Amino acid sequence: MQYAKISGTGSYLPANRVSNDDLAQKVDTSDEWITARTGIKFRHIAAENEKTSDLAAEAARRALDAAGLDSGEIDLIIVATATPDMQFPSTATIVQQKLGITNGCPAFDVQAVCAGFMYALTTANAYIKSGMAKNALVIGAETFSRIVDWNDRTTCVLFGDGAGAVVLSAADKPGIIHSKLKADGNYLKLLNVPGQIACGKVSGSPYISMDGPGVFKFAVKMLSKIADDVIEEAGYTAAQIDWIVPHQANRRIIESTAKHLGLSMDKVVLTVQDHGNTSAASIPLALDTGIRSGQIKRGQNLLLEGIGGGFAWGAVLLQY
């Protein structure tokens, strides 16, 4: 049997960097209020002419460079996004075109919001383990600034745009050690964008609707449990985890998971202060940041975990 390992990572952030003080000039908020509740200081916002596929393609190019691969060697593309360029075709096929990949490899999107990268990575791992792919491009990319109500201070301060990518390649021994995905649609009202496109118009609100306390309570509980489950099912202990690479939504949620596992924040790759919540992009963005900064080194054990609307959540234990 062949296994899958990460052979390269890349990320991209739009040039426009927006501070908490910038937002305080537009809505009734402050740097102190945002930082105390979320840990967020900055977020990046895509330019008007930048689409999700543009962010994704640039992150992918950087991941390919890191892996030492030509785009033509990719035989699977999966893009995790809740903010696609258009209703169809998939953002993955648009990225395929922008990268000049003409080998006919499968390309499709996965939508699990902030857990999307976990779903995409797990799917790509299964493709490689089955022998259906050798080099998969797995991307998380979002332009959440376009589904945020910039007059709603409870949500507009939280989100940012960006993209992260990994190249997952066939290997003789496991890089992806174990993964677990979960979902529960009974909580869909806590976090959603209710608007629908039909008959030439948008029916319902096109903006994010969120019950912050409800999301926080569920996230803390389920992320702790799935972290425990993935580690135990793999035959590992929390002490063997070198780095947690979490979904970067809220510093307090991240701290809660680390505390539950008995790990200090020194073992957490933290980027929420610089990126805000970039949904499906946040984990691969943090992963690439940790690798390029020299924090994460080859041979180390990483726990990736995240949760998004639905709810959908997941965790992946891997050796980098």
From Swiss-Prot:
Question: Which pathway does the record list?
Answer: Lipid metabolism; fatty acid biosynthesis
Classification via Gene3D superfamilies = 3.40.47.10
User: What GO molecular functions are on record for this protein?
Assistant: 3-oxoacyl-[acyl-carrier-protein] synthase activity; beta-ketoacyl-acyl-carrier-protein synthase III activity
Any Pfam family: ACP_syn_III_C
Q: Where in the cell is it found?
A: Cytoplasm
Q: Disulfide bonds, which pairs?
A: none
| SUPFAM superfamilies membership | Thiolase-like (SSF53901)
Q: Which CDD domains match?
A: KAS_III
The superkingdom listed in its UniProt entry is: Bacteria
Query: What EC number(s) does the entry state?
Result: 2.3.1.180
What are the start and end residues of every segment in region (ACP-binding)?
248-252
* Entry keywords, A to Z: Acyltransferase, Cytoplasm, Fatty acid biosynthesis, Fatty acid metabolism, Lipid biosynthesis, Lipid metabolism, Multifunctional enzyme, Transferase
Q: Catalytic positions?
A: C114, H247, N277
Cellular component (GO) terms are: cytoplasm
Using the UniProt record, give the first listed, main subcellular location.
cytoplasm
Catalysed conversion reaction: malonyl-[ACP] + acetyl-CoA + H(+) = 3-oxobutanoyl-[ACP] + CO2 + CoA
Gene Ontology BP annotations: fatty acid biosynthetic process
Tell me how this protein assembles: Homodimer.
- Domains (record comment): The last Arg residue of the ACP-binding site is essential for the weak association between ACP/AcpP and FabH.
Its annotated function is as follows: Catalyzes the condensation reaction of fatty acid synthesis by the addition to an acyl acceptor of two carbons from malonyl-ACP. Catalyzes the first condensation reaction which initiates fatty acid synthesis and may therefore play a role in governing the total rate of fatty acid production. Possesses both acetoacetyl-ACP synthase and acetyl transacylase activities. Its substrate specificity determines the biosynthesis of branched-chain and/or straight-chain of fatty acids.
The similarity comment for this entry is: Belongs to the thiolase-like superfamily. FabH family.
Q: What is this protein called?
A: Beta-ketoacyl-[acyl-carrier-protein] synthase III
* Lineage of producing organism: Bacteria, Pseudomonadati, Pseudomonadota, Betaproteobacteria, Neisseriales
